[in-house]
Amino acid sequence: MELAVMSPVLNGMGTLEAALEYLHSLGVKSMELGAGGYPGKALMDPKEFLGKPEKIEALKALLAKYEMNICAIACHGNPVHPNKELAKDFHDQFVDAMKLAVELGVDTIIGFSGCPGDCEDSKNPNWVTCPWPSEFSEILEWQWNEVVIPYWKETVKIAEEIGIKKIALEMHPGFCVYNPASLLRLREAVGPMIGANFDPSHLFWQGMDPCEAIKVLAGAIYHFHAKDTKIDAANTAKNGVLDTKHYRNILDRSWVFRTVGYGHGKDVWNNIISTLKTVGYDGAISIEHEDDLMSSKEGVEKAVAFLKEVIIYEKAGEMWWA
């Protein structure tokens, strides 16, 4: 396993080199590079590099200068948005990000499954969370069979032509893929290029046990986000977990995102890392900071210190005791 940081956390540093220098000073040797979509292009805009071999070589030299590996390219978006212009923009950015990944020797691209509307004439996405009244079940089947599955079948073909090996979709509420069952549904329909970007922060508040979810997804986990969630037991007892209050309304929300260790303790994270290792995942553990109680810098540094104690870096030796 390797410790990584998702670059949008460091967008405020202004330049990619400043972010690389900072991570190098922390002993971090891997970066998840944001290059479009919701992560933005503050530190990396693929269009500035694609078709320009000299700029690609300069970028590789910059990464080598700070001993930095790019573990994946992040370009989360909603490529099946009912607004066709938005959908095309998200799709085009995703394709550019895939092309950049291959130029840099990176085989994994990260995104969202997306969420369509409820019909061809919709203006906004419609995330279905219940089967009744029956219209919701009908909407869900239309979304999957007419939009999501066809879109990803075509996008996988494009990815294969470009040279991408893995599409790691983040299981995120608000999108059609939001838990292991929906991730596996898409994977079974489209093929093994589709896998999970496993972010336990989105599973904690839905009531899932990340370790059990990891077991269900064994062999289909292509990336991992290290982000925590703090559940407010009192607010959850009163209002449940479907909470639309702003994330800054910490006192009244049922849950909020936290830096690793501030939602769940070391034992929980030890078990998550151990379960990942058990199912054969040996890739990046990428820090994502969305904690409104501390700065990005403090959050990253606390997460780095915490995870250095938790991550299993080496392969297990011979079982000499058995």
Model-derived regions, located:
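Catalytic domains of carbohydrate-active enzymes, especially glycoside hydrolases
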Residues: 18-38
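A structural motif
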Residues: 28, 101, 106, 164, ...
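A short, acidic, flexible beta-alpha connecting loop/helix-capping segment that sits on the rim
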Residues: 10-11, 286-295
